[in-house]
């Protein structure tokens, strides 16, 4: 009950932290989509790149999040931004790459060869086939990678509070330092709820964007 009272009494503060957390995750995952999807397309077209690119992305994901945030501090200190949003978003961006690149590669690489041949047969260029045939067919799997990245990094971004990124992780950090169980429980609940709601919303968006013929 104390936790519920705390959340009700601090609803505005919690809402502000939630929107900040959401914005940070959206920024990091958005950058990963902009870079990761084209990178997935590239390694499908140039297959010799697949092993080193996917291997590097996998290696990044094996680094503990607190260690990766720690690595960002001296790197970004060189440009005067050792703590704060920039190193946090960069670290979460790196974590987001693997599921997006891997799912894009898997989805496009597993398409029936006949689809590409049919596109060539009617005179479509590579980019036309990609835009009108391959990406729509691969969209459900690609979107699955995006959903994985978002849900995973809602939790990772909470840890970024230790380097001054803000967001819901502040509740956990302040709860630990102040031995305030209400803040700890409130932070954990808000992070879990945010992950569940975003996963559901992205699933609905995935259904809407997926062509009717392959739902």
List each language-model region with its residue ranges.
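Alpha-helical membrane-interface segments at transmembrane helix boundaries
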Residues: 12-23, 54-61, 73, 77, ...
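Transmembrane alpha-helix signature in integral membrane proteins
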Residues: 14-42
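Loop-to-helix entry region at the N-terminal start of transmembrane alpha-helices
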Residues: 16-24, 71-99, 139, 183, ...
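Cytoplasmic-entry segments and transmembrane alpha-helices of multi-pass inner-membrane transporters
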Residues: 39-72, 92, 102-106
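Short cytoplasmic-facing helical segments at TM-TM junctions of multi-pass membrane proteins
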Residues: 103-142
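Transmembrane alpha-helices
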Residues: 127-159, 186, 191
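Hydrophobic alpha-helical transmembrane segments of polytopic membrane proteins
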Residues: 168-204
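Short cytosolic juxtamembrane segments of multi-pass membrane proteins
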Residues: 206-215
